[in-house]
């Protein structure tokens, strides 16, 4: 399918700069407008990216602020990158080394002689201010907002086998590979492989992907993917609770995807949770002496507060919202808007003592039944878990309204998060949806009819080898990574 001109997302930009210089950037990126897609849950949909005056100004402001932060860092990361220490403000040889080193990493190619000469002209500012770092700061600011840094400019030659395809050049392959596995731009070792022309070899790409898989950047990258996929990116909770919940879920992904290389969909089925004493107390579970993996309620992330809090409405849980999130994100179902005469801004009708099973009766309305039979059957199965995951046997404030935790998913009756997770983690429908969401994230756009063969191949790959790491490494070695539609 189509490969468009993709701009780095704020997360990719910040993570790439942090990996290169060791200097944090995320707090400076908060004012950079992010593309908001209504068709996929991810922040890298290039079909929603647009250039505006406000974006250009925000990126310029960011580049200036970040460059100042880098040169102020006592560790002198730029000098370490260039391998030289300036003898004075006019040290041209050292500054040209800085230009070549920083330019190569940010633009993913060697700078031409005339480019190095042009950027070396910035030394006049260093001489004027008697400060070598004045030129370095201007250089970093210029390169950070350079189009070749901010955009994935994929170039190549027409394919001899298929004139409709381009065979990507080595630098473009390196960029694709690095962003696929880690969400950051290529490191020095990957650029060296590209410069040696070795990335056309699938076995080399797979080996490089396996190396990158072991980095902290890869773990953070795929945690972000899952957070956006399942909808809990940016929790609006008290900071301490948010940190505890986020750590629990991060530990789940680290264990399933990285440490134990388990089945990908075990994220919905793991029976243990990583709990601190404080989080165990919050959930109403026996507290370990220190943070540890302990038996919990099952269902993997389905019983985590990170996921559950999304289903809060009207001061309590909403079976409809929870079920809708599962149906749309985990089963890739589509829900249309409610009828225009339905009031969604007020709680479902019913007396003060009415139980939810009575009040959530929209399935009895013909115009609403099609959606609510699906969403409410899913959501009621998680009702034993409160807004942020506390166990309860009855509805809040209604002790007579006991909760049995029964629900229905994919025509199967289940009780509670453990049984729901067992259903979802083994369902072909979830395998297909998971690979669809992965495709959307990797290619940076919604799927199109022309992508069906690729989607089928991804789903078949997961069905055959259900480990997430293997799916990613297979993508890295695949012909699709080194080609694009002309």
Segments from the language model and where they lie:
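Short, solvent-exposed loop/turn and secondary-structure capping segments
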Residues: 19, 28-32, 115, 150-156, ...
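A cross-family structural signal marking well-folded subdomains
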Residues: 47, 144, 174, 180-181, ...
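C-type cytochrome heme c attachment motif
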Residues: 15, 19, 228, 364-373, ...
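Extended, non-catalytic structural segments that build the interaction scaffolds
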Residues: 1-8, 86-88, 150, 154-175, ...
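Short, functional "switch" segments adjacent to catalytic/cofactor/reactive centers
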Residues: 35, 40, 45-100, 385-435
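Sequence context surrounding c-type heme c attachment/ligation sites in exported
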Residues: 280, 294-431, 442, 449, ...
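A conserved hydrophobic secondary-structure block that centers on an alpha-helix together
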Residues: 86-139, 160
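Periplasmic c-type cytochrome electron-transfer domains
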Residues: 1-68, 72-73, 79-83, 101-109, ...
């Amino acid at each position: 399918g189509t490969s468009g001109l993709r701009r780095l997302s704020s997360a990719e930009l910040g993570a790439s700069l942090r990996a290169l210089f060791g200097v944090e950037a995320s707090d400076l990126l908060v004012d950079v407008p992010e593309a908001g897609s209504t068709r996929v849950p991810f922040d890298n949909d290039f079909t929603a990216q647009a250039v505006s005056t406000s974006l250009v100004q925000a990126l310029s402001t960011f580049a200036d602020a970040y460059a100042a932060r880098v040169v102020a860092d006592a560790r002198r990361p730029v000098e370490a990158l260039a391998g030289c220490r300036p003898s004075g403000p006019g040290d041209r040889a050292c500054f040209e080394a800085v230009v070549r080193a920083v330019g190569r990493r940010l633009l993913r190619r060697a700078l031409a002689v005339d480019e190095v000469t042009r950027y070396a002209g910035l030394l006049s500012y260093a001489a004027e201010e008697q400060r070598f770092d004045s030129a370095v700061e201007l250089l970093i600011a210029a390169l950070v907002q350079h189009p070749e840094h901010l955009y994935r400019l994929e170039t190549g030659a027409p394919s001899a086998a298929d004139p409709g395809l381009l065979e990507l050049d080595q630098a473009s392959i390196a960029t694709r590979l690095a962003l696929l596995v880690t969400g950051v731009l290529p490191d020095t070792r990957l650029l060296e492989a590209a410069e040696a022309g070795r990335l056309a070899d699938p076995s080399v790409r797979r080996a490089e992907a396996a190396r990158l898989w072991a980095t902290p950047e890869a773990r953070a990258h795929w945690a972000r993917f899952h957070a956006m996929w399942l909808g809990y990116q940016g929790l609006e909770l008290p900071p301490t609770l948010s940190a505890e919940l986020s750590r629990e879920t991060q530990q789940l992904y680290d264990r399933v995807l990285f440490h134990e290389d388990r089945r990908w969909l075990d994220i919905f089925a793991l029976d243990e949770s990583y709990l601190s004493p404080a989080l165990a107390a919050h959930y109403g579970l026996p507290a370990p002496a220190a943070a540890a993996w302990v038996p919990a309620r099952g269902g993997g992330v389905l019983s985590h507060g990170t996921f559950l809090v999304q289903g809060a409405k009207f001061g309590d849980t909403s079976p409809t919202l929870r079920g809708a999130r599962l149906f749309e994100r985990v089963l890739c179902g589509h829900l249309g808007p409610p009828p225009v005469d339905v009031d969604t801004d007020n709680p479902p009708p019913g007396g003060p003592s009415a139980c939810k099973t009575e009040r959530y009766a929209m399935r009895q309305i013909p115009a609403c039944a099609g959606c609510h039979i699906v969403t409410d059957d899913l959501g009621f199965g998680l009702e034993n878990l409160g807004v942020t995951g506390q166990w309860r046997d009855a509805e809040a404030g209604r002790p007579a309204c006991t909760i049995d935790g029964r629900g229905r998913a994919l025509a199967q009756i289940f009780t509670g998060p453990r049984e729901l997770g067992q259903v979802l983690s083994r369902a072909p429908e979830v395998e297909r949806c998971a690979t669809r969401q992965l495709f959307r994230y990797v290619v940076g756009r919604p799927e199109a009819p022309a992508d069906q063969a690729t989607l089928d191949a991804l789903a078949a790959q997961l069905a055959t080898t259900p480990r997430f790491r293997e799916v990613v490494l297979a993508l890295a070695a695949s012909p699709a990574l080194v080609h694009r539609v002309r």
